[in-house]
Amino acid sequence: MIVLTGLVISVAGIYLATSSLAKPIAPSMRIGVMVSDSGSLYFAGVIQRAAAKLASSDLAETVKVNLVFEDAGDSVFEARNALARVKAFDADLLLAPIESDSARLVAQFTKDQFPIIATAPLADDVDNKQPFLRLTSSHSQDIISLAEMISRDRPATVLIVYSSDQYGKDVMKSLAFGLTLRGVPKVQVIGINELSAIRKIRPEVLIVASMEQSVGFFSSMRDWLPQVEQIYLVPGNLANYTAYPWAKTLKGTKAILPKDPTTAEFRSRLASALGRPSLLSNPKAPIFALAWHTYEAVLLAGQAFLEAKSANPDSLRTALLNSKSKGELRFQSSGYLRDVDYTVFGYGVLGSYAPEGSFSPN
């Protein structure tokens, strides 16, 4: 079984020196890292590179990790070319792109040739016949966890208002299903633009399932919102609203996000590797979580390689699926994270949010 503890995994004793005087030569594996050098997340590539290299350096005495970095882009042509270079590199394992559209292309063209680890949240339909191993919770896991938290307070009525885009519809469906399954007596769903219909309802709990349309909704319904006992937001609209005149109406509103896995030591190492000490001024920046999961993925891959004693794809997958975190299996058989803990955020009178507690859906 694989166990990661702290920033460095213990792999002592996996292989033996051929003599007491000679230093053993570490076995070698190859990892392809699909970085984001273009598109809206163009800035992430340099972060992914630095994190992967840190992990490779930390593993150097036990397994030599050779890395190749490729950008899958957002077109079939770019993805094919990037994967062709990864295959020419003879990679044993792949870190997936951090955007779902690019990850779908990679899944389409790899055809289960090697295990794939996802280091960022991807859509639930991103998979091969052999599942991606996800080091972050999926969007659906986060939404179902929110439904679990809400249901534990036993509300009698819950109203979900949702936007007309795909995000709003998907979140609404997951929430409605999760709440109903958990015994909430009355769950209503209404489009976010149906303001007259919404005003006629007096729900105990309101969930706003939208992104950009949330601002318009809050503005139009500022006089109605105080009548709701508890408001919840979703990851897509968890934001700072201090600039808006209606911000105070969000006081007491709650939301959840997966707990930040990074440490001050890791953030400092990353900033130093990048030569960008200014990054430390915002320790909650999302780039640190991406960097950590990239670092973690390379460590996990190296340990799986040693456990499997082979670069055979099936052996590597088995070793990865059997990996543990805090004494428990890390992944479900589907490749999803088995246990995810959350930070609960609450809004103050100024329309900004801050951590106020923890939640575990397990």
Which role fits each region the language model picked out?
Residues F43-Q48, D58-V126, K200, E212-G216:
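Beta-alpha junction/loop-to-helix N-cap segments that form part of ligand/metal-binding clefts
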Residues G275-E356:
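Segments of small-molecule ligand-sensing domains
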Residues E61-G73, Q130-P131, L179-E194:
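Short beta-strand elements in bilobed, periplasmic/extracellular small-molecule ligand-binding domains
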Residues I25-A50, D58-A60, P97-I98, V158-V161:
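Short beta-strand segments enriched in small/hydrophobic residues
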Residues R134-L159, D170, N193-L195, S214-V215, ...:
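Hydrophobic alpha-helical segments within soluble ligand-binding/sensing domains
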Residues I2-Y15:
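Hydrophobic membrane-insertion alpha-helices, especially the h-region
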